[in-house]
Structures are given as C-alpha cells and as structure tokens.
Amino acid sequence: MQTLTVDLGDRSYPIHIGAALLTRADLVLPHLAQKRVMVVTNTTVGPLYLAQLKAALEAAGVRVAEVVLPDGEAYKNWETLNLVFDALLRERAERKTTLIALGGGVIGDMTGFAAACYQRGVPFIQIPTTLLSQVDSSVGGKTGINHPLGKNMIGAFYQPKLVLADAATLGTLPARELSAGLAEVIKYGLIWDVEFLAWLEANMDRLRALDAEAISHAIYRSCEIKAQVVAEDEREGGLRAILNLGHTFGHAIETGMGYGAWLHGEAVAAGMVLAAETSQRLGWLGEADVARTRALIRAAGLPDVAPNLGVDAYLEYMGHDKKVEGGKMRFVLLKKLGEAVITDAVPADVLTAVLTPPH
C-alpha cells in the first residue's frame, strides 16, 4: 500500500492506494466520528463490493446502513440525490454519521454533495471503484450534480476524510470505463509532467491490460499531481483550473450529446485534442505535439475526434462553463507538452476553425 496526503491544514486527509483495501476496516475506523455509516453505491457496484465492505465494517463494530442508486451519468440529478436524503432521514442519521461513497465519479460526486448538505455538513469517505474516480474525481473535494443546461453546475467544495483507492476493483471495470479513466491520467502528463507523458506512451498496453505495477504507478502519480495542485489552490481561484484541460469542450460534448451518451473521460479526451489544436493555432504547440497527443489518446482506446454539435451549440454550452469570468470564456490550453496555461484570449475565428469539422 502507498499513501499520499492532501495537505489542507486541519482538513488534510490521506489517499491510500493498493490492492484488497476494501476489507481494511482498520484504515477506515480512525476517520469515523462515530461507529455509524451510510454506504452510498449503485446497482452495478453494489452487487460486486457492498457485501464485503459491509461485512468488514460490521466485524469492526460499525453500524452500516446503505442506499443503492441507479447507475449512470443520467441519474446525477436532484431526484437521485433526494434518494440519499430520504435514506439519511429514514435512518435518523446524525451529524457524526459518516457517508461512504462506494462507486465511480457519479456516486462520489453525489455522496460528497449529500454530505455537504445534510444537516449542513456530515463527514464522508471516498472509496472509488473506477480508474477515473481513483485518479481524479475522488480527490480534491469537488462535489455536485448536473443540470439540464450544464454539467456539475450545482455543487460544493467539500473535502472527504479519507480516500481508499483499491486497484483490485478495476478487475471488474468494463474496458470502455478503463479507457475513460485513462483520459484523466493522460491529462496529468499533458498539463504537468512530460516525463510521465512519455511513460504513458511506453506503458499504455500494460495499463490497458491492468498490469498491477503499471496501474499502481499511474494512480499514484496522478493523485500526487492532483494533491499538489489542490493543496496550492483548493477552491479553483487560479492554478487548479489547469486540471480542467479538455473539460470546457468536454462538458459541452456531454451536455450536447445527452448525459451518459459519451462517458466523461471520452468527452474529455476529444476535448483535449480540441485544446491541443487550439494551442497549435495560437502558436504554442507544433504539429508533432498535436499528433503525439492524438496518438496517445487513440492508444488508450479513446475518441480523438469530437462529435459535430455545430459551432453555435458548442459556444452556447461552453458559455455555461464555470470558468467563465466577466462574460468571457476561459480556456485551459498548452504552452507546451507538460505545461498548461489559462487564457481568455482565444480569437473567435480560431474557436470557429477548431470547432468546424473535420478536426
């Protein structure tokens, strides 16, 4: 097992990364305010992992309640969130009752948001079971739900007490979901660490084959970069926005196609290609850099061509982006591979050219 710390002063918390951590109640117990939890999971992950987590906690004397939600991005909304509140109220959950998110990014985001809201804030723990949630969404305290007009538009910054990333759960992950997670891993190389990017190019086959050593390294390095960025800028006042490479375009793809049609990682992958092409048109990246980005995204089994929503639709959806400031869209682009920049100075003709097929 490897451990990282997200350094946020008295709200710091550990990220434990390893195999067979799901049954390690000894890792969970120190972070419980009372021996009482509510596990939030979904209809896919619950049948696979809920029983063993519950048994381990109950054997340690913890009272465990559960709520099982429908699976999918299409359910990341108020109606589903209310099912969590219904369960908490039925169980008479208290302010010291800990919520445990057992699932991927949707479950983690909704559980964290429920924890931030219920009785104005109860503790929660992240047990991410997808690669995307293990390397990205479980770390850093972004929680929330979608709105028909925009992804993740309703939410809160609310940090977990613990992140438990059990790489063994990736064994049941469909190949498409694994690839979606690799998009966020690639993102860290593009924005922060060109050596990690080169390592990903050399090891993509191992990662897709779930080679234990390769997967552990990818999770650790991704979390290490994210923890460093979040520690410097928890609430996305500046630096943290670089973690959104590909997300301005990607969120527009998800909204425009209908939540769940494209997985988040797939939309981000295509969005990162659009960001690379924009960076090239601004004179920052060379043609070879864009080709290298595309090739790695394809090697991960991800789309490198964005859907044709039409320029106007893209601009409409991107106008709802959370990085918009003073009515101006702000983009995360690449000064070079391994170095991101945030800018609002993207000329309209450049955007139009990038968003007009063929890409």
UniProtKB/Swiss-Prot annotation:
Binds 1 divalent metal cation per subunit. Can use either Co(2+) or Zn(2+). SUPFAM superfamilies: Dehydroquinate synthase-like. NAD(+) binds at residues 71-76, 105-109, 129-130, 142, 151, 169-172. This is 3-dehydroquinate synthase. One of its GO terms (cellular component) is cytoplasm. The keyword Signal does not apply. It is found in: Cytoplasm. Keywords: Amino-acid biosynthesis, Aromatic amino acid biosynthesis, Cobalt, Cytoplasm, Lyase, Metal-binding, NAD, Nucleotide-binding, Zinc. Belongs to the sugar phosphate cyclases superfamily. Dehydroquinate synthase family. Zn(2+) binds at E184, H247, H264. Pathway: Metabolic intermediate biosynthesis; chorismate biosynthesis; chorismate from D-erythrose 4-phosphate and phosphoenolpyruvate: step 2/7. Transmembrane segments: none annotated. Its cofactor is Co(2+); Zn(2+); NAD(+). InterPro entries: Dehydroquinate_synthase, DHQ_synth_AroB, DHQ_synth_fam, DHQS/DOIS_N, DHQS_C. It comes from Thiobacillus denitrificans (strain ATCC 25259 / T1). GO terms for biological process: amino acid biosynthetic process; aromatic amino acid family biosynthetic process; chorismate biosynthetic process. NCBIfam families: aroB. It holds the Pfam family DHQS_C. Catalyzes the conversion of 3-deoxy-D-arabino-heptulosonate 7-phosphate (DAHP) to dehydroquinate (DHQ). It catalyses: 7-phospho-2-dehydro-3-deoxy-D-arabino-heptonate = 3-dehydroquinate + phosphate. Its EC number is 4.2.3.4. CDD domains: DHQS (cd08195). GO terms for molecular function: 3-dehydroquinate synthase activity; metal ion binding; nucleotide binding.
